Amino acid sequence: MKFIDEARIEVMAGDGGNGSASFRREKFIPRGGPDGGDGGRGGSIYALADRNLNTLVDYRFTRMHRAQRGENGGNKDCYGKGGEDIVLRMPVGTVITDLETGELVADLDEDGKQAIVARGGKGGLGNLHFKSSVNRAPRKRTMGEEGERRALRLELKVLADVGLLGMPNAGKSTFIRAVSAAKPKVADYPFTTLAPNLGVVRTDQNRSFVIADIPGLIEGAAEGHGLGHQFLRHLQRTRVLLHLVDLAPFDPDADPVRDAKAIVEELRKYDESLYNKPRWLALNKLDLIPEDERAARVAAFLEAYGPVERHFEISALTGDGCRKLVFAIQDFLDAGRAQAEAEKAARTHAEALAAAEAEARVEAAYQARLQALLAEGETGTGDDGRDGNENDPADEQDTNRPNH
C-alpha cells in the first residue's frame, strides 16, 4: 500500500432536527395542550487511532465526510431520532489541525484514543417547553442548531523511540536490517529508501524499542531539496537520534565531516527542538577500512567534527559493534522511561495535593458562611423574618399549644 503521511479533509457534522409545534387532538378535548417534541441531535464526527493502519491514503481520495442530520420532533411529545455519528479511523501518530485557525484539534498518539473533530448540532425545542400559566397554547418552537464544519489537515508522525539520520547511502537501511526484523530495500545507489521504515529492536524477552529509518538527507533538505525533508516530521516524536556517517565513501571527493555537519545544520534549520534532541554518532562501514587504519580514521574524524555526546564504531553489514550500540540505546531509553514515570508520579501527587487544598478551601468557606448565617439567626436578622424578640406572641402561641 502506498505510504501517504499527509492529507486534507472536510468534516461536516449533522444539523440538529427542528422542534415541533403541535397540539393534542383527543376525543372530547377540542383544545388540547401543546405536545410538540424536540428535534434529534445531529451526528458528530470522531477520529479514532487504529494501530492496524499505517497510511492516510484513504483520506487522500475521500475528502468530504458528512454526518447524518437529526430528525425533526413530532406530535405526542415524540422526540426526533438523533443522527448517526461517524468514526474516522486513522493511524496511531496522526496529528489533526484546523486549517483555518491552526488550532490543534487532536493528537492520536495512543492506540484506541478517540477525539471529536466536529460536534453535531443540538436539536430544537418543541412547543411543549414554552407552556406557562399565561400562555397555555404556545406556538413557539426552536430550530435545530447547525453542526460544526471544519477543514482539517491530517499529518502522520510515526511513533518511534530512535530516529536514523544520515546522507543517502550511509547504510541506514542496512543497519535497521541488521538489528531488527524489518527488511527495507538495500542497494548501492542513493535514495533507495523512499518512505519511512520502522523496525522493532528486541534486546531481550522483555525489552525492546522502535527505530525509524527515513530517506537520506542532503544539503538544502530544510528548503525542500531531496526526499528527506518530507519525512523529517517523523523524527519529532523520537527520544534519541542516531546519526550514521559513512567513513569509507566510494566518492574520493566526499568529505564525511562536511556531510555530517551538513545534516546537523539541516536539523537546526528545520526545527530547533529536533536539533536539540540527544544525538549520537554511529561511524559506519569500518569493514571497508583496513584494520590498521581504523583508529586513525576515527580519531581524525572526531577531531575535525568536534564535541559529540556519544559515538560508536560499527559495521552494519557485518554487525560489528551493533550489539553494543543497541544495548546502549536500550539502557538510555529505559532510564528515560523511569525518569518520566517518576515525574508523572510526582505530578500526580502534586495535583492531588492541590485538589485537596482547593477542596479544603471550599469547605472552610462553606463553614464560615454557615457560622455567619447561624450568627444572624441568633441576633434576629435571619431569613425567617423574626426580629429576635423572645416575647414574640407568635412564639407564646406556639408554646401554649396542647400536645396531641
Curated annotation (Swiss-Prot):
Cite the binding residues for GTP. Answer: 166-173, 191-195, 213-216, 284-287, 315-317
Question: What is the enzyme's main class?
Answer: hydrolase
Signal sequence range? none
Annotated GO biological process: ribosome biogenesis
Query: What range(s) does the OBG-type G domain occupy?
Result: 160-334
The protein's predominant localisation is: cytoplasm
Superkingdom of the organism of origin = Bacteria
Q: Where does Mg(2+) bind?
A: S173, T193
Q: Where is the composition biased (Gly residues)?
A: 33-43
CC annotations in GO: cytoplasm
Where found in the cell? Cytoplasm
Ranges where the record places region Disordered: 22-43, 373-404
Co-factor requirement: Mg(2+)
Protein's job: An essential GTPase which binds GTP, GDP and possibly (p)ppGpp with moderate affinity, with high nucleotide exchange rates and a fairly low GTP hydrolysis rate. Plays a role in control of the cell cycle, stress response, ribosome biogenesis and in those bacteria that undergo differentiation, in morphogenesis control.
Describe its partners and assembly state: Monomer.
What is the official name of this protein in its record?
A: GTPase Obg
Classification from the root reads:
Bacteria, Pseudomonadati, Pseudomonadota, Betaproteobacteria, Rhodocyclales
Gene encoding it?
obg
